Each structure stands twice: as structure tokens, then as C-alpha cells.
UniProtKB/Swiss-Prot annotation:
This protein's domain notes: The MPN domain mediates deubiquitinating activity.
Protein name (Swiss-Prot/TrEMBL): Eukaryotic translation initiation factor 3 subunit F
Presence of the UniProt keyword Membrane in the record: no
Entry's transmembrane regions: none
Region (Disordered): 1-91
Residue ranges occupied by any MPN domain in the UniProt entry: 96-226
Record-linked InterPro entries: eIF3f, EIF3F/CSN6-like_C, JAMM/MPN+_dom, MPN
Chief place of localization: cytoplasm
Protein localization: Cytoplasm
Gene Ontology cellular-component terms listed: eukaryotic 43S preinitiation complex; eukaryotic 48S preinitiation complex; eukaryotic translation initiation factor 3 complex; eukaryotic translation initiation factor 3 complex, eIF3m; synapse
Length: 361
């Protein structure tokens, strides 16, 4: 990701907000004999970025960033990272699945933004399958915006992606995110740069300002529109956004949701015994619901559902048949193993603490 940001001298024409597609005109550049016609967001590797012709607009970027008005050092951008990317335009029904860590990271980066920054942007990472795009990670990218230009630290983004690949080599660049409830002319420029890293990238918007009383989360992909041979525009088409989570993420989300009922918005971590007790209570409530449903079906109060019946039968068949005496023996053996591991862990901790005190004497 080595392409610099470019100025936006001609503001795009933006249509109505989502769920209708958002239409944005591509940025215009000074006419020169060697400048090709504007291209869609998924720019070929040989197309140079447009450059502003007004020297008064060019302003120095922050340290480590590439000024928006500077032309690319090489006319051919860096090649995309290898690996399966988004296979062309999104087919109908393509779904974007977001994990809770994405939203938490975006909100955290917005709260820690530099003074005076209107919004924050970042890179989305994840995986792709035939029916959905799963966004599992992200990181923020420093940038500066003004009315005339935008400067993005693409070198920082490249280095961060290389570090993420060492931990999660299967995660690919899927697109980028931005805080706010609308799409600006700068969004078109930034989206064009990410199209060089991933075909048909996703643009995720998170309304951290709560314009309508809630955090609106929307995802878009861009498509080219316009008359051939004329100034082309970019249309941002909304996608379906769903939320997915692993079991460990679900535990954290459930714990965070409990703070809604706390007066000071703070809740302490429960002990292992309390967690086991809470899980047992939830299982008991679920079994009570199943038994009540079965009794209502047998009594004729509720019509039978074959799908529910097959699901319950599958659950019953998965329960192993164990003799009560054998189950008690297995449980006691596991408890003894757990107590032994706990004892050894505490003994090791005490030995380490004693060793540190002896070293400091």
C-alpha cells in the first residue's frame, strides 16, 4: 500500500443516503495530454493517480505521510498481496459479517483520535467465502484531511498489515472503514487506493456521532457508472451487514451488555464458581422451556413443528449414556486433577515470588 493520497478539487455529486445507492462523481484532474480518462475504483495497475494542477492547494503532509498533491514516484502502483481476494463484483445477497472486536476497535480509535480530527479511517482484515465476507480484524491508519486534500500514511498501513500477517496469515485486506454517517469526496479517493490492494473493496461506515440516536453501521461496494468517454462517477451500493462472533467473543459481549443495567456502567468480573453457577442456571432455564414446549405439543395447545422435533431428537441422541456410578467416578477424578493443577500452580507462583525476593536482597 504505497500509493499517496490525492487532492479532491471537484466535489462529487452525492445522491440519497442508504439504503439507496450513493452516487459519487470521480475526482477531476487538470487536463494534460498524457492523462488517461478517469477509471473506476478498481484501477488497473498501470493507471497513475490524478494530480492537482493548483500549486496553492499543495500543503505539506504530516511526518511519515505522503502529501496529497505529490505524484506517485512510479507510475505503476505496488502489486497487490497474493491470496484469494474478493472475486469481482458482489453477487446478489452477498453478506458482510462483522465481529464485535471490529466495532470495539473502531470506537476505541475514534475516542483516541488526534485533537481536531473529524473522523478516523482504517483497514479491514478478514476472510472471504462464496456467500459472505467475514471481517475479523482491523487497524487504524493515520491521515490528515482538509477541504482541498487528504494525506494518508500508506507506509504505516503497509507495515501494520505485514505485522498482522505474521500473527494471522489467513487474514486478507478486505477494504477500509471510516467513522461518520455519510460518504464524502475524500472517501472516493481513499476507496480508489484500497482498490489497488483488494479487488472491489468494502467501505464500512460507523456513525460514532449517533446522528439518529444509535450507532448506524453500513457497508458499501463501489461500481462505475456514467457515459463512456465522459467523466465517470462511482456509485456506492449498500450491502447486508450481519454480526458474527466466536464463543469467546460472545462471553465478552454478554459481560459488556450487563453494564447497561449498572448505574455506574461498571461491572466486576465473576469468579469461576459464579460462572459455573450462571451457566447451570441458564441450562436449567433452557431445559424448562423445552419441557414446557413438549407438554404444550402433547396437550394440543401448540401445533407440532417437525424441524423442532428433529432438532430435539438430535440433541437427545448426542447425550452419552453413562452409568451413574461411572459418572460419579469420572467427575471425582476430574475434580482431583483440577485441584492438583491448582495446587501446583499456586506452589510455582510462590516459588517465583520467593526467588524474586532473594534476588533483590
Amino acid at each position: 500500500m504505497a500509493s499517496p493520497a490525492v487532492p479532491a478539487n471537484v466535489p462529487p455529486a452525492t445522491a440519497a443516503a442508504a439504503p439507496a445507492p450513493v452516487v459519487t462523481a470521480a475526482p477531476a484532474s487538470a487536463p494534460t495530454p498524457s492523462t488517461p480518462a478517469p477509471t473506476p475504483a478498481a484501477t488497473p495497475a498501470a493507471s497513475p493517480a490524478p494530480v492537482s494542477s493548483d500549486p496553492a492547494v499543495a500543503a505539506p503532509a504530516a511526518p511519515g505521510q505522503t502529501p496529497a498533491s505529490a505524484p506517485a514516484p512510479a507510475q505503476t502502483p505496488a502489486p497487490s498481496q497474493p491470496g484469494p481476494a474478493l472475486p469481482g463484483p458482489f453477487p446478489g445477497g452477498r453478506v458482510v459479517r462483522l465481529h464485535p472486536v471490529i466495532l470495539a476497535s473502531i470506537v476505541d480509535s475514534y475516542e483516541r483520535r488526534n485533537e481536531g480530527a473529524a473522523r478516523v479511517i482504517g483497514t479491514l482484515l478478514g476472510t472471504v467465502d462464496k456467500h459472505s465476507v467475514e471481517v475479523t480484524n482491523c487497524f487504524s491508519v493515520p491521515h490528515n484531511e482538509s477541504e482541498d486534500e487528504v494525506a494518508v500514511d500508506m507506509e504505516f498501513a503497509k507495515n501494520m498489515y505485514e505485522l498482522h500477517k505474521k500473527v494471522s496469515p489467513n487474514e486478507l485486506i478486505l477494504g477500509w472503514y471510516a467513522t461518520g454517517h455519510d460518504i464524502t469526496e475524500h472517501s472516493v479517493l481513499i476507496h480508489e487506493y484500497y482498490s489497488r490492494e483488494a479487488p472491489n473493496p468494502i467501505h464500512l461506515t460507523v456513525d460514532t456521532g449517533l446522528q439518529h440516536g444509535r450507532m448506524s453501521i453500513k457497508a458499501y461496494v463501489s461500481t462505475l457508472m456514467g457515459v463512456p468517454g465522459r467523466t465517470m462517477g462511482v456509485m456506492f451500493t449498500p450491502l447486508t451487514v450481519k454480526y458474527a462472533y466466536y464463543d469467546t467473543e460472545r462471553i465478552g459481549v454478554d459481560l459488556i451488555m450487563k453494564t447497561c443495567f449498572s448505574p455506574n456502567r461498571v461491572i466486576g468480573l465473576s469468579s469461576d464458581l459464579q460462572q459455573v453457577g450462571g451457566a447451570s442456571a441458564r441450562i436449567q432455564d433452557a431445559l424448562s422451556t423445552v419441557l414446557q414446549y413438549a407438554e404444550d405439543v402433547l396437550s394440543g395447545k401448540v401445533s407440532a413443528d417437525n424441524t423442532v422435533g428433529r432438532f430435539l431428537m438430535s440433541l437427545v441422541n448426542q447425550v452419552p449414556k453413562i452409568v451413574p456410578d461411572d459418572f460419579e467416578t469420572m467427575l471425582n477424578s476430574n475434580i482431583n486433577d483440577l485441584l492438583m493443577v491448582t495446587y501446583l500452580a499456586n506452589l510455582t507462583q510462590s516459588q517465583i515470588a520467593l526467588n524474586e525476593k532473594l534476588v533483590n536482597l
